[in-house]
Amino acid sequence: MGQETEINKRYQVAKERYQAIGVDTEKALKTLKDIKISMHCWQGDDVKGFLNPDGELTGGIMATGNYPGAAHTPKQLRQDLEKAYSLIPGKHKLNLHAIYVDTDEKVDLNEIEPKHFTPWVEWAKEQGLGLDFNPTFFSHPMFKDNYTLASPDKEVRDFWIEHGKRSRKISEYFGKELGQTSINNFWVPDGIKDCPIDRYTPRKRLMEALDEVFAEKLDEKYTQEAVESKLFGLGAEAYTVGSHEFYMGYGITRDKLICLDAGHFHPTEVISNKLSSLALFSKGVMLHVSRPVRWDSDHVVIMDDELIEIGRELVRNDLLGITNIGLDFFDATINRIAAWVVGTRNTQKSLLKALLEPTADLKKMELENDFTSRMAITEELKDFPFGDVWNYFCEINGVPVGLDWLKEVKAYEEDVLLKR
């Protein structure tokens, strides 16, 4: 009771300080509670999945480390996810990849059906979660010569076209069963290691293959598709078919969401600067919040400048309504549940920081060229008691405050993870 009283006292002081500059903390907390983060399942097992967990991870990505306790079964993964969600304020979504089938049947990617994901749906209902989806265009023998949908081999293309079509039905099933729109994100790692002669033809093949995948009209109440670009991957350093320009053109002309992954661009290029432009011309955005360290390394999201800027862009420009926020990182050198908790809570914190700005006043100052006041206030805000508002948010949502969550993760590691 003592800690609760202290948290509440500190919040009341913070509330008054923010009120003095025209910020309503109660409104900010209500807005934050309604924002769902799509937490990715693949942090829990280092992107192995359950279709062929002993196979090679391909597609130009890499999970490094060998921290004990990775999930080996759907049941273990769900158990770990439940622990993570219990430490994160609010109700959210889970982002599944197609390789995370939960079935006793022997199925391939071009054979998957909604029934192979029914245990995930039943679990999501119990937990009050939504489900997003991703077809898996990697870690499979039909990922041939670094190509899937853009392959010159029709047999390879047809296999992956069928996989894409089936993934749409699964995403639709999620939306119908759970009453939340399921975002189905298409990332295709096709590319070439060294400089190609023909950049045009593979892109034409990819465009035509995607058109075939998306030919059937599905109700967007249940599922919406996003398309995700990438600059390069391991083994595809010189050329990736699905570049930013390709998918921006494809998404805008085909009425698809544009997925921006924080690690899929040049090292000095940031996705925060792209959001306002995409908001003007595209249907909407799917975010993969990640942290690239010199390349698309998929480090756990920390409270760095870019994460703060992403939050600001979404809030300042009123883009939350057209943005689906997902996470994409996988670090096998640390406790995987801690990775989820740190990344998700940090993403929420970045949004709260932005929600606690006097945005309308700052915009007015900027419009009137009062850059002095703009600078003074934004700098002073850095010393405002944001942490007290965040702690109160955790408290009223029934999750651990401060580092208390780490104690629970350590205990879970001792009781569960180290016994696997």
UniProtKB/Swiss-Prot annotation:
Gene3D superfamilies: Divalent-metal-dependent TIM barrel enzymes
Name the record gives this protein: L-rhamnose isomerase
EC supergroup of this enzyme: isomerase
Annotated keywords: Cytoplasm, Isomerase, Manganese, Metal-binding, Rhamnose metabolism
Catalytic activity: L-rhamnopyranose = L-rhamnulose
Enzyme Commission designation: 5.3.1.14
Named cofactor requirement(s): Mn(2+)
Record carries keyword Metal-binding: yes
GO molecular function, one term: manganese ion binding
Pathway membership: Carbohydrate degradation; L-rhamnose degradation; glycerone phosphate from L-rhamnose: step 1/3
Top-level lineage group: Bacteria
GO cellular component assignments: cytoplasm
Residues binding Mn(2+): H264, D296, D298
Protein family membership: Belongs to the rhamnose isomerase family.
Cellular location(s): Cytoplasm
Pfam families membership: RhaA
Gene: rhaA
Job of this protein: Catalyzes the interconversion of L-rhamnose and L-rhamnulose.
Cofactor binding, per record: Binds 1 Mn(2+) ion per subunit.
NCBIfam families xrefs: PRK01076.1, rhaA
InterPro entries for this protein: L-rhamnose_isomerase, Rhamnose_isomerase, Xyl_isomerase-like_sf
UniProt-listed GO biological process terms: L-lyxose metabolic process; rhamnose catabolic process
